[in-house]
Structure formats: structure tokens, C-alpha cells
């Protein structure tokens, strides 16, 4: 529910629209959304993972990305926040990091920067 309260863009705003019309249904909405919220399952992630966050993301607010990262169960995890980036979360700047990550974890080799 954090993203819904922090974000005023669609698709999250559609849930806010619904709750404005039916505030009494908030508990049911929260219960249903828990089935779809990745944060609820983050502790199950045990494989190596990289997470990139756009600090100006108005679709998935950075606060939710940090919360997700904190809850990830994997010991081998890396966080890459990108200032000045929105929902694309530094995709073009991040591609070299992704390439090195997959080379290391899928191909078993290190790639120099």
C-alpha cells in the first residue's frame, strides 16, 4: 500500500479513486493487494540479485524500492540508486552492470569495466 499512498499516477491512482468512493473497503483492498505486492515475497529471494532505483520515479517511488531491497533474503544483493532518473531507473547507465552480473552468475566469468 505504500506505493499507492506515495504515488499519484496510474495504475496506482485507480486504487485511490476506488478507495475515495469506498473508504470502508480499505481492509479488503489491502488484503487483496498483499497477494500482488512484491515486497510481501522479497524474503523468499535467495539468488544473487541487483536492484536499480530511479530516485525521481513517480510510478514506483524510491521508498518502495529501498523497502524491497531491505527485505530481500539473498546475501548477495546490490542496490543501484540513480539520481535524476524516473521509472526507467538508469536503464542505459545500468546496462554494463547488468552485463557483468549475468556474465558472473550465468557464465561464471568476470568482465572488466
Sequence positions of predicted segments:
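Short, conserved loop/helix-junction motifs that constitute active-site signature segments
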Residues: 44-45, 72-74
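Short alpha-helix in the alpha/beta-hydrolase fold that links the catalytic acid
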Residues: 47, 61-70, 79
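Acidic catalytic loop of the alpha/beta-hydrolase fold
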Residues: 55-60, 88
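Histidine-bearing beta->alpha loop at or near hydrolase active sites
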Residues: 79-101
Amino acid at each position: 500500500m505504500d506505493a499507492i499512498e506515495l504515488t499519484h499516477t496510474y495504475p496506482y491512482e485507480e486504487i485511490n479513486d476506488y478507495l475515495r468512493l469506498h473508504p470502508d473497503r480499505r481492509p479488503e483492498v489491502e488484503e487483496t493487494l498483499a497477494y500482488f505486492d512484491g515486497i510481501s515475497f522479497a524474503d523468499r529471494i535467495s539468488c544473487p540479485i541487483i536492484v536499480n532505483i530511479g530516485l525521481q520515479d513517480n510510478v514506483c517511488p524510491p521508498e518502495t524500492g529501498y523497502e524491497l531491497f531491505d527485505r530481500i533474503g539473498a546475501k548477495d544483493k546490490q542496490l543501484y540508486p540513480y539520481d535524476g532518473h524516473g521509472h526507467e531507473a538508469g536503464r542505459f547507465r545500468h546496462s554494463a552492470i547488468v552485463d557483468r552480473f549475468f556474465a558472473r552468475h550465468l557464465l561464471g566469468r568476470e568482465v572488466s569495466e
